[in-house]
Amino acid sequence: MLYFLAGYFAELEFLKSIYLRTFLAFVVSFCIVLFAGKPFIKYLKVKKFGEEIRDDGPSSHFSKKGTPTMGGVLIIAAVLLTSLLINDLANRLILLVLISMLMFAAIGFIDDYRKFTVSKKGLAGKKKLLFQATIGLMIWAYLYYIGLTGRPMIDFSLINPISAHPYYIGAIGMFILIQIVLMGTSNAVNITDGLDGLAIMPMIICSTILGVVAYFTGHTELSSHLHLFYTVGSGELSVFLAAVTGAGLGFLWYNCYPAQIFMGDTGSLTVGGILGVIGIILKQELLLPILGFIFVLEALSVILQVGSFKLRGKRIFKMAPIHHHFELMNIPESKVTLRFWIATLIFGIIALGTIKMRGIL
């Protein structure tokens, strides 16, 4: 809305500045979550939307029973309102990301709501994957019919994150890749969201770094210098990601140990999906596993645990996801969380480093 008004009033021309709007997006979304947090938590308590705790989980988690969940609604609402207020809504990429976000949010919300009204298992896993695949189909259709970079050979290529060399995989290959990326990021963040503040801070770090990459990709000179594939309008995604970062930081205020609220699937599936969608738009599909190393580690620990038990009848870890394994090794929850944050920051710096290394190797 502000961007729209700036086009009609010369006095508001300064509102078109991407730097100013990025700052405003961060502040506005942060304040929305911060000030709406307390009444929202009270509302969830009244409605008795509280977390259920696994009986076989660490004993320290039993005290978390009844902690309000579905906090992702607050994050999504803040990002949506901020984006509608500050983003350039004529930008196709912003509209694509907003639609994707709402679709992921719908999956998560239905899953959370069913846990309280129908079954503790929530939405069936196959249905979740089917709905996520539908979002993937929409993203693929955008690439196929509209395109990103204006070069189909690049749009349907996998980009080496270090050398920037494109590997053409075709439309079918890209369809498969998109499904893997979206299902992977969305569900990996969901798996990680098992300790107070564990998932939200890595998400903040990832969205911040992706915001920097989005700005570089949407800048003609910087994208050329850094061997990124220039995409018209992608710089606007840095404003959107600033809103995600601000909302995440505001949520961390209430989600840090001891948590007053949890994201629930509404939040974790959505923020993971957002990272995946924007990674695809920026042609950074292979940068995502580096940037989101902790999410990959958590997801792999579950896959290995299940696979090992089915094939050998033995477990690799004391409990999966791996953050529970560390807890059962008597490492305090807060220490596990902080170490995972540190690891995410390190891999985030490495991910940024690969951008700078492009063209050297």
Please report, for each region that a protein language model flagged, where it lies by residue.
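Alpha-helical transmembrane segments
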Residues: 2-41, 79-106, 139, 145-160, ...
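Membrane-interfacial helix termini and the short, flexible loops that connect transmembrane helices
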Residues: 44, 113-121, 260
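Select subsegments of transmembrane alpha-helices in polytopic membrane proteins
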Residues: 64-76, 127-135, 333-343
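Membrane-interfacial loop-to-helix junctions in multi-pass inner-membrane proteins
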Residues: 90-98, 117-131
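Membrane interface segments of multi-pass transport proteins and intramembrane proteases
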Residues: 115-124, 156-167
